[in-house]
Regions:
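Active/ligand-binding-proximal structured segments within catalytic/core domains
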Residues: 1-17, 63, 91, 128, ...
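Buried hydrophobic packing residues in well-ordered domains
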Residues: 17, 35, 51, 72, ...
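Helix N-cap motif at beta-to-alpha junctions
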Residues: 40-43, 139-143, 267-270
Length: 284
């Protein structure tokens, strides 16, 4: 989006979005790259046109790529300063060893430094294909209208050499591997720990029950000043025994697997063992 397209300059693209009163952004997760727009009902067609133009006609100028490379390197530095992000990256690395889900979203620094324009264009040609993309609308948009917009703007997309059938995946399901990693830093003021078991996928019938279970176990943070009795029984135990500064339960789902667990921060170096004992005993 920062490079402009064959039909729109970067400035022209920004001005067009601003004049619509719209919001245009993109993000990458461990499984998807998403380009999205929020616009008024009357501007849905133009919003889809803009997204289509970005996906299919981006210029990828060398100077713009270098600017974005610097942005990503700075972003990576900021992520590495956030202990919670580092802990969850390590958790994914050991839970899904040797698999795509075990990699970080930004990737290693050497890849960011070495990626070239040819790498990007080859990736777009091989991955931005009709069988690997989905157009989704929510809110003030009619289904039939969105179908027509998809036909208008995306019908010319090629398909992969080995097309992916709707509702299937070309990859093996993620394999959860029980393991452990510890990173010691004697200068750190807190112990930051994540413990997880294999969770469920988005399409699992247990997806919503696992979210309910996450809510039952709850979250707690001493700095918020709320009474431990207002949350789960576990929060009362943690508060009374000074086991942690805070904890939160999480249920992270992917297309074919997931992680369910707890993340805790504590100034008490022995609290990990005690909190784990309460978790396994089912003290809610």
């Amino acid at each position: 989006m920062r490079t402009g397209t064959n039909n729109r300059t970067q400035h022209g693209l920004e001005l067009e979005v601003e004049n619509l009163g719209a919001h245009l952004n993109a993000y990458t997760s461990r499984e998807q790259t998403v380009f999205y727009a929020k616009a008024f009902r009357k501007d849905v067609g133009q919003a889809v046109d803009i997204i289509s133009d970005i996906l299919q006609n981006s210029k990828l100028d060398a100077s713009a790529i270098e600017r974005e490379r610097d942005v990503i390197l700075r972003e990576q530095e900021e992520v590495e300063k956030q202990v919670e992000e580092v802990v969850f990256d390590n958790l994914h690395e050991v839970a899904f060893q040797g698999q795509a889900l075990g990699r970080t979203i930004l990737g290693p620094k050497e890849n960011i430094l070495s990626i070239s324009r040819n790498d990007l264009t080859n990736y777009i040609k091989s991955k931005y294909t009709a069988d690997r993309m989905v157009l989704v609308g929510a809110g003030g948009v009619e289904h039939e209208e969105l179908v027509k917009l998809a036909e208008k703007h995306f019908s010319g997309l090629p398909v992969s050499q080995n097309p992916i059938q709707l509702g299937t995946s070309q990859y093996e399901p993620g394999r959860f591997i029980g393991s452990e990693v510890r990173v010691r830093d004697d200068t750190a003021s807190t112990c930051n720990v994540a413990i997880a078991v294999e969770g469920v996928s988005w399409k699992s019938p247990d997806y919503y029950p696992m979210l309910v279970l996450q809510s039952i176990f709850g979250n707690w943070d001493r700095s918020l000043g709320s009474s431990p009795l207002m949350s789960s029984r576990l929060s009362h135990i943690v508060s009374t025994n000074n086991l942690a500064n805070s904890f939160m339960h999480f249920s992270t789902s992917y297309s074919d697997t997931g992680l369910w667990g707890v993340y805790m921060v504590s100034e008490n170096p022995v609290s990990y063992t005690h909190l784990r004992a309460h978790e396994t005993r089912g003290n809610l």
